[in-house]
Amino acid sequence: MDTFLFTSESVNEGHPDKLCDQISDAVLDACLAQDAESKVACETCTKTNLVMVFGEITTKANVDYEKIARDTCRNIGFVSDDVGLDADNCKVLVYIEQQSPDIAQGVHGHLTKRPEEIGAGDQGHMFGYATDETPELMPLSHVLATKLGARLTEVRKNGTCPWLRPDGKTQVTVEYYNENGAMVPVRVHTVLISTQHDETVTNDEIAADLKEHVIKPVIPEKYLDEKTIFHLNPSGRFVIGGPHGDAGLTGRKIIIDTYGGWGAHGGGAFSGKDPTKVDRSGAYIARQAAKSIVAAGLARRCIVQISYAIGVAEPLSVFVDTYGTGKISDKDILKIVKETFDFRPGMIANNLDLLRGGNRYLKTAAYGHFGRDDADFTWEVVKPLKWEKPQE
């Protein structure tokens, strides 16, 4: 059997870039909760003892940006300089302006356009991907790396591993077999975890706890064997972390947010952007389309691309590739996709209920936007596709 290795990584919620994603999306949630028509393009950056929230926001909502930034940092666990940031005493700078009137006129006619008329907030191309290798219809390498990161946070917050600090990274290498275009996982080749920790714990204790409380509950036993390689805090020491260790910026973890290097990416980040920004809403509907194709049995693996022009409602192009796994031709699948999904930005927002705030976007900002079992992730709902199996 001819196999190959493929690797995906993840970072958990205390990573500086992910901290910024979460602050940006918490701001978006707060704006949408009070004003569903909010236009939000919110960026965040952070370094030692500093968080800056900046961008373009037009909203009727009364939002305390500084409070949102501090609350988000605190909820992650940044409660002292020792762990990388002190939420209550760090400096928070806010530089927010309104959306350009030129963009507002071209995209939503200063809120006068009907949903079906609303244009894309910018040009760009977005991808959706799905594969039958996991129940989530997501790549196994990405699913495992992401779940390891989430588990690190869980055992930190519930006290199972009290020596853990908020920052951490994971990486999983999976050995795969290509079965006529479909990806079949054979085994886990390598597991890498680098996690921030306090001064008191030894490397041996770290390795033992990570194996017992993080790896064991996450990675199914069938994928682990005596040859699986474990790199657990391979640099030896990771006490200084969070924004004290590295600067952070919104939108720098776009592969972690999506498919772990599988499929493709148009380059546009998600966090801090309202649904008129097709970087986000376009990628969400493309995932729903790809997932629905695989769930319907039309293909074992699929990628969908859509593209837009600023101010134009209809997509410029829609593309489907099933990597040779389709039960019918890609051309016929594309026809079904176009008949089933409305790719106009205003209609995506309506059909996926994307104008609702709360904490639904904050939830997306750590541990991936796709493959999540959560009612707020409306783009994960499979749409039934009508097709007839060809005669054998």
Curated annotation (Swiss-Prot):
Query: What InterPro entries does this protein map onto?
Result: ADOMET_SYNTHASE_CS (IPR022631), S-AdoMet_synt_C (IPR022630), S-AdoMet_synt_central (IPR022629), S-AdoMet_synt_N (IPR022628), S-AdoMet_synthetase (IPR002133), S-AdoMet_synthetase_sfam (IPR022636)
Assigned GO CC terms = cytoplasm
Which compartment or compartments is the protein found in?
Cytoplasm
Cofactor needs = Mn(2+); Mg(2+); Co(2+); K(+)
Give the cofactor note: Binds 2 divalent ions per subunit. The metal ions interact primarily with the substrate. Can utilize magnesium, manganese or cobalt (in vitro).
Domain of life per record: Eukaryota
Q: Know the name of this protein?
A: S-adenosylmethionine synthase
